[in-house]
Amino acid sequence: MKQRKTKRKKTINQKVKNATPNIYDGIEFKSKLETYVYKQLKAHNLKAEYEPIKFELIPAFAFCGKKIRAMTYTPDFVGDNFIIEAKGKPNDVWPYKWKWFMWYLLNKGLAEKYKLFVVHNHKETDECIRRIQEL
């Protein structure tokens, strides 16, 4: 009897699911939502960079002679006083990294500098843009 191969469902650290990459203004976005956020920021003359900096949340270290990689987080959009994360469908690691990122900002004295926004759709993006304009 022939054995059937079954696909194992990936559960650990899944990357972007069901996202459609886009290129707009020469920038390669990972999803349509990120492209929409960028277009809205640009339409409202709000200055923000796309994935400009990678924050090292936990530095690399050695454990029992084995190198452990640093844990990093790259926000989607960073402006002078705001950070926007466009999250269509969160993966399994997202909630932890977001908490560590907030902790990082707090401990580096940056929590007062940045207002954090997480958007999941166009409606939330539009509301986010409105709130940023009020800052």
PLM region spans:
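Electrostatic, structured charged patches in enzyme active sites and in nucleic-acid/phosphate-binding
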Residues: 1-135
